[in-house]
């Protein structure tokens, strides 16, 4: 579906995409807030965005500036994204699970000029305020029932209206190649890297997902993945907007409320990771609770890490809901492949390219035959412009005109792709990316640790769990529990090892490279 009428051309940036929907269907519902029951039609949403944009302008935000967003899932999170975009500013979502020093790194590295922060997290910003020299303005978002007083500066007592009609901010020229989002993902050095995604990237991925899954204005998606990840932004928000549909914003995944939400809001699809499917199966082994209406549910969309075939089979049989697997990464805005939402689905496969190009190459960047393993490479409208302030990382990732994902997989004779391993050793725990070296460096800071190595190990609930191996310094004594507690104080909880084993030595190859497969074998056999 290409969004063209006699009056408006195909949108090339996110402001045009929003304006298109307001022009076409101003009274059509767009956002439903589960936490307080509020609704935004497209017209009301646009008004709220313009008012929030005016607030940012009043605090000196201009085109090209970065605005950090530290908020829980809410309708206001989407409003904040668009308030940045209509000004030509970059939205900088911050993972709320990070520790304070991790937040400071992301905010400082992105050179953010302003921040929108929920009152729930305000104390965390106060704790590191002196370490955020570039941040000129902090604007707080409160959960007040009066929608006219939700955004305010921390220093002020008066709120700023976001619901009533407001004069639009100055109309800034925005091109499809202008930056829209800087989102941080772990890099090969263990330090997070800022992915620069353009307006064209985000619009393209919304179009690709919406068209592939045949979304229409009748579709109502459920956003339960965190909005600081591109999964929630692209898969269940922007694709809904592109199709003229709607999305229900839930603060977080709740096992007890999940099927009620599907029924009450008549949700037709939702985004998920394998962990969520497993939890739902364990909680509702007999299927959807009686009295709830889920017949309108078309399918579940699942990504981040491969889903075990047995989980897919059980989920589809138990809940009569197909699971459509896909593959992508922050660097591809979100999705690069999806299984077809029909009988062609292949459990275990991540599907077919949905609008970008994708192939498998060897270490010399030569194409490999179907069925042979190699590195997955991508190119297309949804691929990032580059890494912020990281020209070397950008040059390494883009070779011969293709983005190198670091993921190992293969393509079958029918064009379906399969992800087998991650070349980069990245751990994906419940949809969260974890780079082992970061954990290693924390462990090395402990006075009793001589050597450390972290790996991902299979886990029925989270897909992967974090396990570490350490060698003690001569004469040192420390328990595994003490080491885990040490890590808990220094990294986000989801990154913390759940198992730390003390070993005599870390297995290494002839070149000194740690043999992580040997560590995995040791973990599995002990």
Feature locations, PLM:
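AMP-binding/adenylate-forming catalytic core of the ANL superfamily
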Residues: 98, 104, 115-117, 270, ...
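Conserved pre-ATP/AMP-binding loop-to-beta segment of ANL
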Residues: 26-29, 139-140, 164-184, 191, ...
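Conserved AMP-binding/adenylation subdomain of ANL enzymes
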Residues: 203-220, 228-269, 282-288
